[in-house]
């Protein structure tokens, strides 16, 4: 097992917690201070890259996952695909809808032009909460023919059950709260 202690220390030390945001009763983990600290960002990217060193493509989830995914792809020498929220890409696109607490959302990637068929993909995002977004991302890249070899996040909120929802995929979270 890889030692992620430097990344865990940086995340624990630098994360800013905001109570009652974006709504009452929610405690929001703002990882912006982790990303803005050069050493913090470096050790987090290094730890995420260690999760799947042989991956061919990073699937970076809109929007904070873009910051991490680009760094991880650069570290590994792999490609990166931006998994976008609906309506941000020109057609044709592949899409995957998923359920939110109050409605649905859709994620998209370009159809056909990014060559995912048969390639190994690591899905990267900042936070795992309920797992809806990450599950939809994994299903989306699989629909393009990719093999999801793992999911890696900086912070996991265990009480929200996302790990169980993602049970079929190898999952690494640097910090669990």
Curated annotation (Swiss-Prot):
Signal peptide: none annotated. Pathway: Purine metabolism; AMP biosynthesis via salvage pathway; AMP from adenine: step 1/1. The keyword Transferase applies. One of its GO terms (cellular component) is cytoplasm. One of its GO terms (biological process) is AMP salvage. Pfam families: Pribosyltran. It comes from the Bacteria. Its main location: cytoplasm. CDD domains: PRTases_typeI. SUPFAM superfamilies: PRTase-like. Keywords: Cytoplasm, Glycosyltransferase, Purine salvage, Transferase. Its EC number is 2.4.2.7. PANTHER family: ADENINE PHOSPHORIBOSYLTRANSFERASE. Homodimer. Catalyzes a salvage reaction resulting in the formation of AMP, that is energically less costly than de novo synthesis. HAMAP family: Aden_phosphoribosyltr. This is Adenine phosphoribosyltransferase.
């Amino acid at each position: 097992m890889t030692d992620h202690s430097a990344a865990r220390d940086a995340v624990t030390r630098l994360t800013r917690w905001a109570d009652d945001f974006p709504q009452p009763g929610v405690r929001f983990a703002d990882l912006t201070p982790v990303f803005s600290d050069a050493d913090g960002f470096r050790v987090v990217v290094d730890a995420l890259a260690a999760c799947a060193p042989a991956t061919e493509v990073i699937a970076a989830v809109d929007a904070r996952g873009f910051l991490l995914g680009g760094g991880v792809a650069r570290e590994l020498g792999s490609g990166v695909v931006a998994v976008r929220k609906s309506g941000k890409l020109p057609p044709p696109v592949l899409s995957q809808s998923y359920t939110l607490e109050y409605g649905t959302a859709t994620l998209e990637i370009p159809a056909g032009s990014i060559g995912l068929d048969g390639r190994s993909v690591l899905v990267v995002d900042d936070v795992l909460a309920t797992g809806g977004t990450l599950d939809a991302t994994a299903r989306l890249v699989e629909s393009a023919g990719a093999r999801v070899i793992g999911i890696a996040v900086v912070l996991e909120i265990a009480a929200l059950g996302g790990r169980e929802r993602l049970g079929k995929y190898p999952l690494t979270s640097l910090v669990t709260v």
